[in-house]
Design a protein with these regions (language model features):
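Generic beta-strand/beta-sheet core signal
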Residues: 1, 8-10, 38, 47-49, ...
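Structural motif
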Residues: 1-3, 217
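Cys/His-rich short segments
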Residues: 3-72
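Generic structural "secondary-structure junction" signal
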Residues: 9-13, 24, 37, 54, ...
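Conserved NTP-handling cores and scaffolds of large molecular machines
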Residues: 11-15, 64-67, 86, 124, ...
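Catalytic cores of large soluble enzymes that bind and process phosphate-bearing ligands
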Residues: 19-20, 48, 52, 70-71, ...
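Long, charge-rich boundary regions
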Residues: 53-106, 110-111
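DNA strand-break repair and replication-stress modules
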Residues: 105-253
Length: 253
Protein backbone atom coordinates (compact mmCIF):
# COMPACT_ATOMS: atom_id res chain seq x y z
CA UNK A 1 0.00 0.00 0.00
CA UNK A 2 1.30 3.44 -0.92
CA UNK A 3 1.56 5.93 1.96
CA UNK A 4 0.85 9.47 0.79
CA UNK A 5 1.73 12.18 3.34
CA UNK A 6 -0.70 15.04 3.88
CA UNK A 7 0.42 18.62 4.48
CA UNK A 8 -1.90 20.01 7.14
CA UNK A 9 -0.30 23.40 7.65
CA UNK A 10 2.87 25.44 8.06
CA UNK A 11 4.81 26.03 11.28
CA UNK A 12 4.68 29.83 11.24
CA UNK A 13 5.97 30.08 14.80
CA UNK A 14 9.23 28.46 13.73
CA UNK A 15 9.97 31.27 11.28
CA UNK A 16 12.60 33.78 12.42
CA UNK A 17 12.34 36.26 9.56
CA UNK A 18 15.35 34.98 7.64
CA UNK A 19 13.20 33.01 5.22
CA UNK A 20 12.92 34.15 1.61
CA UNK A 21 10.08 33.57 -0.78
CA UNK A 22 10.98 30.87 -3.30
CA UNK A 23 10.46 31.67 -6.96
CA UNK A 24 10.46 29.13 -9.75
CA UNK A 25 13.61 29.56 -11.90
CA UNK A 26 12.87 30.74 -15.42
CA UNK A 27 15.96 29.14 -16.96
CA UNK A 28 16.92 25.46 -17.14
CA UNK A 29 20.02 24.47 -15.11
CA UNK A 30 21.73 23.87 -18.46
CA UNK A 31 21.72 27.66 -18.83
CA UNK A 32 20.65 27.65 -22.47
CA UNK A 33 16.87 27.36 -22.52
CA UNK A 34 13.82 28.68 -20.71
CA UNK A 35 11.65 26.55 -18.48
CA UNK A 36 8.09 25.96 -19.66
CA UNK A 37 5.01 24.62 -17.92
CA UNK A 38 3.18 22.32 -20.32
CA UNK A 39 -0.58 22.81 -20.35
CA UNK A 40 -2.41 20.43 -17.99
CA UNK A 41 0.92 19.33 -16.48
CA UNK A 42 2.42 20.46 -13.19
CA UNK A 43 5.96 19.45 -14.09
CA UNK A 44 8.24 22.21 -15.46
CA UNK A 45 10.25 21.18 -18.50
CA UNK A 46 13.17 22.62 -20.40
CA UNK A 47 12.03 24.21 -23.65
CA UNK A 48 15.17 22.90 -25.36
CA UNK A 49 13.93 19.33 -25.52
CA UNK A 50 16.66 16.95 -26.66
CA UNK A 51 18.90 19.94 -27.44
CA UNK A 52 19.29 20.41 -23.69
CA UNK A 53 22.52 18.76 -22.53
CA UNK A 54 20.98 17.70 -19.22
CA UNK A 55 17.91 16.21 -20.90
CA UNK A 56 20.12 14.39 -23.39
CA UNK A 57 22.22 12.88 -20.61
CA UNK A 58 19.15 11.82 -18.64
CA UNK A 59 17.61 10.22 -21.75
CA UNK A 60 20.73 8.10 -22.22
CA UNK A 61 20.75 7.15 -18.52
CA UNK A 62 17.09 6.10 -18.74
CA UNK A 63 17.71 4.19 -21.98
CA UNK A 64 20.35 2.01 -20.30
CA UNK A 65 18.63 1.76 -16.88
CA UNK A 66 16.68 -1.16 -15.43
CA UNK A 67 13.49 0.49 -16.61
CA UNK A 68 15.00 0.77 -20.10
CA UNK A 69 17.23 -1.87 -21.68
CA UNK A 70 18.93 -2.75 -18.37
CA UNK A 71 22.47 -2.69 -19.77
CA UNK A 72 24.55 -4.14 -16.94
CA UNK A 73 27.56 -1.94 -16.19
CA UNK A 74 26.11 1.10 -17.95
CA UNK A 75 25.59 3.12 -14.78
CA UNK A 76 24.98 6.84 -14.48
CA UNK A 77 28.65 7.35 -13.63
CA UNK A 78 29.75 5.30 -16.64
CA UNK A 79 27.51 7.28 -18.98
CA UNK A 80 28.80 10.58 -17.59
CA UNK A 81 32.36 9.39 -18.18
CA UNK A 82 31.56 8.31 -21.75
CA UNK A 83 29.99 11.71 -22.42
CA UNK A 84 32.94 13.56 -20.89
CA UNK A 85 35.40 11.75 -23.16
CA UNK A 86 33.12 12.19 -26.20
CA UNK A 87 32.72 8.45 -26.73
CA UNK A 88 28.94 8.85 -26.96
CA UNK A 89 26.62 11.74 -27.75
CA UNK A 90 23.35 9.91 -28.50
CA UNK A 91 21.80 6.65 -27.30
CA UNK A 92 22.66 4.93 -30.57
CA UNK A 93 26.36 5.67 -30.00
CA UNK A 94 26.33 3.09 -27.21
CA UNK A 95 26.23 0.36 -29.83
CA UNK A 96 29.30 1.68 -31.63
CA UNK A 97 31.50 1.49 -28.53
CA UNK A 98 34.55 -0.74 -28.84
CA UNK A 99 36.72 -2.44 -26.26
CA UNK A 100 39.69 -0.40 -27.50
CA UNK A 101 37.83 2.82 -26.65
CA UNK A 102 36.81 1.75 -23.16
CA UNK A 103 40.16 0.35 -22.04
CA UNK A 104 41.73 3.79 -22.54
CA UNK A 105 39.41 5.41 -19.98
CA UNK A 106 40.78 6.20 -16.49
CA UNK A 107 40.41 3.30 -14.02
CA UNK A 108 39.00 0.97 -16.67
CA UNK A 109 40.41 -2.55 -16.65
CA UNK A 110 40.13 -5.44 -19.09
CA UNK A 111 37.27 -7.19 -17.30
CA UNK A 112 35.18 -4.04 -16.86
CA UNK A 113 35.51 -3.10 -20.53
CA UNK A 114 34.83 -6.64 -21.75
CA UNK A 115 31.78 -7.05 -19.51
CA UNK A 116 30.24 -3.80 -20.72
CA UNK A 117 30.70 -4.72 -24.38
CA UNK A 118 29.06 -8.10 -23.66
CA UNK A 119 26.13 -6.41 -21.90
CA UNK A 120 25.65 -3.99 -24.78
CA UNK A 121 25.61 -6.82 -27.31
CA UNK A 122 23.13 -8.75 -25.18
CA UNK A 123 20.77 -5.76 -24.94
CA UNK A 124 20.37 -5.75 -28.73
CA UNK A 125 18.32 -8.93 -28.32
CA UNK A 126 15.76 -7.11 -26.14
CA UNK A 127 12.12 -7.46 -27.26
CA UNK A 128 10.62 -4.49 -29.13
CA UNK A 129 8.36 -3.56 -26.22
CA UNK A 130 11.40 -3.05 -24.02
CA UNK A 131 13.11 -0.93 -26.67
CA UNK A 132 9.95 1.15 -27.07
CA UNK A 133 9.94 1.78 -23.31
CA UNK A 134 13.64 2.68 -23.31
CA UNK A 135 13.11 5.41 -25.90
CA UNK A 136 11.57 7.51 -23.13
CA UNK A 137 8.52 8.69 -25.05
CA UNK A 138 6.39 10.59 -22.55
CA UNK A 139 3.49 8.55 -21.12
CA UNK A 140 4.76 5.32 -22.73
CA UNK A 141 6.00 3.10 -19.94
CA UNK A 142 6.29 -0.69 -19.88
CA UNK A 143 2.57 -1.39 -19.63
CA UNK A 144 1.66 0.95 -22.51
CA UNK A 145 4.57 -0.25 -24.64
CA UNK A 146 3.46 -3.85 -24.19
CA UNK A 147 -0.10 -2.92 -25.08
CA UNK A 148 0.99 -1.17 -28.27
CA UNK A 149 3.22 -4.04 -29.38
CA UNK A 150 0.48 -6.57 -28.64
CA UNK A 151 -1.94 -4.73 -30.89
CA UNK A 152 0.34 -3.67 -33.73
CA UNK A 153 3.05 -6.32 -33.63
CA UNK A 154 5.98 -4.04 -34.43
CA UNK A 155 7.45 -0.64 -33.67
CA UNK A 156 7.22 0.41 -37.31
CA UNK A 157 3.49 -0.34 -37.43
CA UNK A 158 2.99 1.67 -34.25
CA UNK A 159 4.71 4.64 -35.86
CA UNK A 160 2.61 4.22 -39.01
CA UNK A 161 -0.65 4.10 -37.04
CA UNK A 162 -2.85 7.20 -37.07
CA UNK A 163 -4.76 8.63 -34.14
CA UNK A 164 -7.93 6.75 -35.10
CA UNK A 165 -6.08 3.42 -35.01
CA UNK A 166 -4.62 4.20 -31.60
CA UNK A 167 -7.95 5.35 -30.16
CA UNK A 168 -9.43 1.89 -30.80
CA UNK A 169 -7.08 0.31 -28.27
CA UNK A 170 -8.53 0.07 -24.78
CA UNK A 171 -6.03 1.55 -22.34
CA UNK A 172 -4.39 4.00 -24.74
CA UNK A 173 -5.14 7.54 -23.57
CA UNK A 174 -5.27 10.80 -25.49
CA UNK A 175 -2.06 11.83 -23.72
CA UNK A 176 -0.27 8.77 -25.10
CA UNK A 177 -1.56 9.41 -28.62
CA UNK A 178 -0.56 13.07 -28.59
CA UNK A 179 2.86 12.31 -27.15
CA UNK A 180 3.54 9.59 -29.73
CA UNK A 181 2.42 11.83 -32.59
CA UNK A 182 4.68 14.65 -31.38
CA UNK A 183 7.62 12.27 -30.98
CA UNK A 184 7.23 11.02 -34.55
CA UNK A 185 7.49 14.56 -35.91
CA UNK A 186 11.07 14.95 -34.64
CA UNK A 187 13.37 13.79 -37.42
CA UNK A 188 16.20 13.03 -34.98
CA UNK A 189 14.01 10.47 -33.22
CA UNK A 190 13.35 8.62 -36.46
CA UNK A 191 17.05 8.69 -37.34
CA UNK A 192 17.81 7.14 -33.95
CA UNK A 193 15.33 4.33 -34.62
CA UNK A 194 16.81 3.67 -38.05
CA UNK A 195 20.29 3.43 -36.55
CA UNK A 196 19.12 1.07 -33.80
CA UNK A 197 17.50 -1.18 -36.38
CA UNK A 198 20.72 -1.19 -38.40
CA UNK A 199 22.59 -2.20 -35.23
CA UNK A 200 20.46 -5.35 -35.06
CA UNK A 201 17.47 -4.50 -32.87
CA UNK A 202 14.34 -6.47 -33.71
CA UNK A 203 11.39 -4.14 -34.20
CA UNK A 204 8.86 -6.90 -34.82
CA UNK A 205 7.42 -9.05 -32.06
CA UNK A 206 7.77 -12.76 -32.77
CA UNK A 207 4.80 -14.93 -31.81
CA UNK A 208 2.92 -12.05 -30.22
CA UNK A 209 0.41 -13.41 -27.72
CA UNK A 210 -2.54 -11.15 -26.94
CA UNK A 211 -4.87 -13.55 -25.11
CA UNK A 212 -2.25 -15.07 -22.81
CA UNK A 213 -3.04 -15.51 -19.11
CA UNK A 214 -0.24 -13.04 -18.44
CA UNK A 215 -1.60 -10.41 -20.84
CA UNK A 216 -2.06 -7.02 -19.20
CA UNK A 217 -0.68 -8.16 -15.82
CA UNK A 218 2.20 -6.55 -13.96
CA UNK A 219 4.88 -8.57 -12.16
CA UNK A 220 7.82 -7.92 -9.84
CA UNK A 221 10.72 -10.39 -9.87
CA UNK A 222 12.59 -10.73 -6.57
CA UNK A 223 14.84 -13.17 -4.79
CA UNK A 224 17.46 -15.58 -6.11
CA UNK A 225 16.65 -17.23 -9.43
CA UNK A 226 17.93 -20.71 -10.20
CA UNK A 227 18.67 -22.20 -13.64
CA UNK A 228 18.02 -18.86 -15.34
CA UNK A 229 18.62 -15.14 -14.95
CA UNK A 230 16.33 -12.20 -14.32
CA UNK A 231 16.36 -11.00 -17.93
CA UNK A 232 15.16 -14.40 -19.21
CA UNK A 233 12.10 -14.21 -16.96
CA UNK A 234 11.45 -10.62 -18.02
CA UNK A 235 11.56 -11.58 -21.70
CA UNK A 236 9.23 -14.55 -21.09
CA UNK A 237 6.67 -12.42 -19.26
CA UNK A 238 6.80 -9.62 -21.82
CA UNK A 239 6.47 -12.02 -24.77
CA UNK A 240 3.27 -13.29 -23.17
CA UNK A 241 1.75 -9.84 -22.79
CA UNK A 242 2.77 -9.06 -19.22
CA UNK A 243 5.03 -6.33 -17.89
CA UNK A 244 7.72 -6.26 -15.20
CA UNK A 245 8.38 -3.42 -12.77
CA UNK A 246 11.15 -2.98 -10.21
CA UNK A 247 8.92 -2.37 -7.18
CA UNK A 248 5.56 -3.47 -5.84
CA UNK A 249 2.64 -1.07 -6.24
CA UNK A 250 -1.14 -1.14 -6.37
CA UNK A 251 -0.84 -2.18 -10.04
CA UNK A 252 1.18 -5.32 -9.25
CA UNK A 253 -0.72 -8.55 -9.91
Amino acid sequence: MDVIPEVVGSLDKKRDGSQNKWNMPSTCPCGEFKINFIQDEKVPRCSGGTSCKIAKKESIIFFASRTGLEIDGMSKETIESLLTFDLIKEVEDIFSLKYEDLIKLPQWEDKKASNLITSIEKSIKSPPSRLLTALGIRFIGKRTANLLIQNFGSINKILDANSEDLEKIHGISVSVINSLNEWKLVEKNLLTLNTLQEKGFNFEEINTVIDSELSGKTFVITGTLQNSNRQDFINLIEKNGGSVTTSISKNTD
